[in-house]
Design a protein with these regions (language model features):
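Acidic/negatively charged segments and metal-coordination signatures
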Residues: 1-2, 97-106, 110-244
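Compact alpha/beta protein-protein interaction domains typified by the UBC
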Residues: 5, 10-115, 126
Length: 244
């Protein structure tokens, strides 16, 4: 059931949206959920190259908004399906945790649009005109997850990332244990803050799914590596049950 509080929040936030993007409108879908639909136009430049474009978009607002970010679809057919598209046809604005953390900094529709949606659309428009991505491009799938977590945690080793994801997947943060990065410090004095922040933005089950994706990817690359010590307890328990 859609709360009146959510409706009032969206009405208030749409004032800033319509001031900048007057062709975007708040609507209520047949299932009762709120969506923002319409044309979004912009003109900007990078490295002296001017880009002016307009896209038809649909932003779906979750019932848990603003604790959870919206998702966006491009509905005008300008962007091909193979350009950063998720399996549910929403557009991939980044790694899920990355999107959630960015949104939480300013949990409003206008900041979501200007901080995440417009940069995505600008990247497509720029790529269409000039043939390269203006902000670089993260790999897709598990390789992109691995790349993001290395950047977030400031580490380079693949197995270290799996070690951190194991802690998050098991919801097993203990500040007094050695940090998986190998620097010799306990977790709370090393990467504790990053893990606590990540844990605040994503469920353990989502981290488990990411661990599985990264693990499968790494096994293909290095099947003989020693993965002991970085396997979530939930995976170990399931493996033991199957072995009995």
């Amino acid at each position: 059931m859609i709360s009146d509080e959510l409706f009032q929040t969206l009405l208030q936030q749409m004032k800033a949206v319509r001031a900048l993007f007057p062709d975007l409108c708040l609507e209520q879908a047949e299932d009762g959920r709120f969506v923002v639909r319409g044309s979004l136009g912009f003109q900007t430049q990078r490295d002296g190259k001017v880009v002016e474009a307009e896209y038809e978009i649909e932003i779906n607002i979750p019932d848990t908004y603003p604790q959870s970010p919206p998702v966006v679809r491009e509905t005008g057919g300008k962007i091909p399906e193979d350009f950063h598209t998720n399996g549910d046809t929403t557009r991939c604005l980044g790694v899920p945790l990355e999107v959630r953390m960015r949104f939480s900094e300013h949990a409003t529709l206008i900041h979501y649009l200007t901080g995440q949606v417009v940069p995505f659309l600008f990247s497509h428009a720029y790529f269409s005109l000039y043939g390269d991505m203006p902000f670089g491009e993260r790999p897709h799938g598990a390789a992109g997850l691995l790349d993001f977590y290395k950047e977030l945690l400031g580490v380079e080793q693949d197995l270290v990332v799996l070690g951190f994801l194991r802690i998050l997947a098991d919801d097993d943060y203990k500040g007094h244990v050695p940090c998986p990065c190998g620097r010799g410090l306990i977790l709370r004095k090393c990467h504790g803050q990053q893990l606590r922040e990540a844990r605040d933005h994503q469920r353990a089950s989502d981290f488990l799914n990411e661990w599985i994706a990264v693990f499968k990817y790494l096994v293909e690359q290095a099947p003989n590596a020693d993965y002991r010590g970085v396997v979530p307890k939930r995976i170990m328990k399931a493996h033991r049950r199957r072995a009995i």
